């Protein structure tokens, strides 16, 4: 088995999907988890205005709405959380995503004060954060807020991770990568677009340039610029297509060096890191 085949198998990626079937699969997956643990009453997700959180948010609201109707449990709710750092440049996209999702409840937690306070505390301890590390601080503060909300609402935190993100480890460890349940796992980027199109999402929300937008020195830095490959390259790789060796090498390089992000904390029984 080639490394490409191993990666495709590990991430559950497919070369072709039926969008309607995958929508139903994700919704039923979320419902089944909540039904298994009836003390859980909410799904919590941060909404950024980008493709991934818009899709995960819509699927989460669908799952909650269906389950509430099936069980007559009015306590069930989907909580969409806005988590700006100060003023968000694409705030209108966030509002458009909220309008499309129609969440039961919307909360806004501005993380700037908490991030600055943490940065100042570290500075006083002699640690000056780089812009890149400060970006990770933002991602972790966002996740911290979501877990606090989930803790107070008997909820679980929904993640936006998908195959095209997982393969490159393009997420913050214990930030946006630290979630409870990931309904998009297995899908690549273009397949996520297909699901949103099938759901009637406004095109500008899934055709916009993907960006983590974490760094102050490089605001709205496109994911593809940070990775050195395009999402079309990554999706083609995940669909089993043959890529130029130089492109495949970049993708596989990201996969190998970010393996630790896709695992639980390393123990004496792990040996993947010895490769």
Swiss-Prot record:
Binding site for deamido-NAD(+): 140, 173, 180, 260-261
Binding site for Mg(2+): 52, 165
InterPro entries in UniProt: NAD/GMP_synthase, NAD_synthase, NH(3)-dep_NAD(+)_synth, Rossmann-like_a/b/a_fold
UniProt keywords, alphabetically: ATP-binding, Ligase, Magnesium, Metal-binding, NAD, Nucleotide-binding
Pfam families in UniProt: NAD_synthase
Binding, ATP: 46-53, 160, 189, 211
Enzyme class: ligase
Pathway(s) annotated for this protein in UniProt: Cofactor biosynthesis; NAD(+) biosynthesis; NAD(+) from deamido-NAD(+) (ammonia route): step 1/1
GO molecular function: ATP binding; glutaminase activity; metal ion binding; NAD+ synthase (glutamine-hydrolyzing) activity; NAD+ synthase activity
GO cellular component, one term: cytoplasm
Record-listed E.C. numbers: 6.3.1.5
Main function: Catalyzes the ATP-dependent amidation of deamido-NAD to form NAD. Uses ammonia as a nitrogen source.
UniProt family annotation: Belongs to the NAD synthetase family.
Subunit-structure text: Homodimer.
Official protein name in the record: NH(3)-dependent NAD(+) synthetase
Organism: Salmonella arizonae (strain ATCC BAA-731 / CDC346-86 / RSK2980)
Gene from which the chain derives: nadE
